[in-house]
Amino acid sequence: MINIPTSILCRLGARSAISRSFGTSVVTKSEAKTPIQKFGWEYLKKQRDMKRPIAPHLTIYQPQLTWMLSGFHRISGCVMAGTLLVGGLGFAVLPLDFTTFVEYIRGWNLPCAVTAVFKYIIAFPIIFHTLNGIRFLGFDLAKGVDNIGQVYKSGWLVFGVSAVIALAIVINSCQNKSKAVKTA
């Protein structure tokens, strides 16, 4: 009689059982499709043959303030979150802090007009995202959504107030910079 340890037999038995179950449960790609999946696949192939995009494309929609503000709200939120993530990780890993970074930029001695443009590019999305977020909170409370005219008025108001506040911030920072130069 051959003396084989039971642990080996158990392992071999488990392996053969596993391989048998995998061998019988494999389904080919064509068999795995349900009728609705087949319909969807045929529909997509037909659309591709007609040279249509898979999903609706921005070029087929008429530009409207509502979806443009909503899109800019999402984009500005993602850009700000990404900036905070990359900046936070950068300042955590690199051997410099925010003050050193600002002093490095100031060392370039850029004219006020150039820094004003960059400050506006930074300030406008932050203010817009904040004000439009408040507007959307009002929409969540069902305030002003029943009248499309109100929706457009609030959208233009948010856009205009954001532009004015961002401009005021930039003008204030340039005035503070010129005062600091005069006192130095």
From Swiss-Prot:
Alphabetic keyword roster: Electron transport, Heme, Iron, Membrane, Metal-binding, Mitochondrion, Mitochondrion inner membrane, Transit peptide, Transmembrane, Transmembrane helix, Transport, Tricarboxylic acid cycle
Pathway involvement of the protein, from the record: Carbohydrate metabolism; tricarboxylic acid cycle
A molecular function (GO) term: metal ion binding
Transmembrane stretches, start-end: 65-94, 115-139, 148-169
Binding site for heme: H129
Membrane topology designation: Multi-pass membrane protein
Subcellular location: Mitochondrion inner membrane
Residues exposed to the Mitochondrial intermembrane side: 95-114, 170-172
InterPro entries with a match to the protein in the record: SQR/QFR_C/D (IPR034804), Succ_DH_cyt_bsu_CS (IPR018495), Succ_DH_cytb556 (IPR014314), SuccDH_FuR_B_TM-su (IPR000701)
Cofactor field: heme
Principal location listed in the UniProt entry: mitochondrion
One Pfam family in the UniProt entry: Sdh_cyt
Mitochondrial matrix compartment segments: 140-147
Biological process annotations from GO: defense response to Gram-negative bacterium; determination of adult lifespan; innate immune response; mitochondrial electron transport, succinate to ubiquinone; negative regulation of response to oxidative stress; positive regulation of response to oxidative stress; response to oxidative stress; tricarboxylic acid cycle
Protein purpose: Membrane-anchoring subunit of succinate dehydrogenase (SDH) that is involved in complex II of the mitochondrial electron transport chain and is responsible for transferring electrons from succinate to ubiquinone (coenzyme Q). Mediates resistance to enteropathogenic E.coli infection.
Family note: Belongs to the cytochrome b560 family.
Complex and partners: Component of complex II composed of four subunits: a flavoprotein (FP), iron-sulfur protein (IP), and a cytochrome b560 composed of two transmembrane proteins.
Name the record gives this protein: Succinate dehydrogenase cytochrome b560 subunit, mitochondrial
Taxonomic path: Eukaryota, Metazoa, Ecdysozoa, Nematoda, Chromadorea
